[in-house]
Regions:
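Long, contiguous binding/interaction regions
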Residues: 1-10, 14-49, 55-159
Length: 159
């Protein structure tokens, strides 16, 4: 059972796409000692807005405080908490090519991924799944001695 005082939370923030907005949001977290586990930012197509997805840890009370503080920032238009969201995370993993090439391909397919590049000595796979399943993929991938694993931040969308 997760510790509700330090539970993983995802907050999605819709902001005006202008300079210094990201700095103001990260400063809000830093000034209060809140940790950001993952941060992704992307413009919203056909608008002057951006979508910021922040993964952090904390209690329900702490998340309420963060949400209230975010609402006070002028370029923030909407704040959505993780219960209302579908989350995905992406991973790129590089493996040495060996006799287990098929196993690596099957493993990545089991986690909504596949082979994205094959070189003479290396294979690169991409996996995109829920954060818990990404953690399991990374654990399972260790048996194939990955040379490198790069995790992207969480992206989320309201249900």
């Amino acid at each position: 059972m997760p510790n509700i005082l330090n539970e993983r939370r995802v907050i999605s923030v819709i902001v005006l796409n202008e300079s210094s907005v990201l700095s103001r949001i990260t400063s809000l977290f830093a000034a209060r000692g809140y940790n950001i586990e993952s941060l992704t930012v992307a413009p919203i197509p056909n608008s002057d807005m951006s979508h910021i997805t922040i993964a952090t840890n904390g209690s329900t009370k702490l998340m309420e405080q963060i949400t209230k503080q975010l609402h006070k920032l002028i370029p923030v238009y909407k704040v959505i908490e993780h219960e209302e969201m579908v989350e995905k995370e992406m991973v790129l993993a590089k493996f040495p090519i060996a006799e287990n090439l098929a196993d690596i391909s099957v493993l990545s397919a089991a986690y909504n991924g596949g082979v994205v590049n094959v070189g003479e000595e290396m294979i690169i796979v991409m996996v995109a799944d829920e954060p818990k399943r990404i953690k399991h993929f990374i654990e399972a991938a260790q048996r194939y001695n990955p040379c490198e694993i790069v995790c992207g931040g969480v992206v989320a969308i309201e249900r």
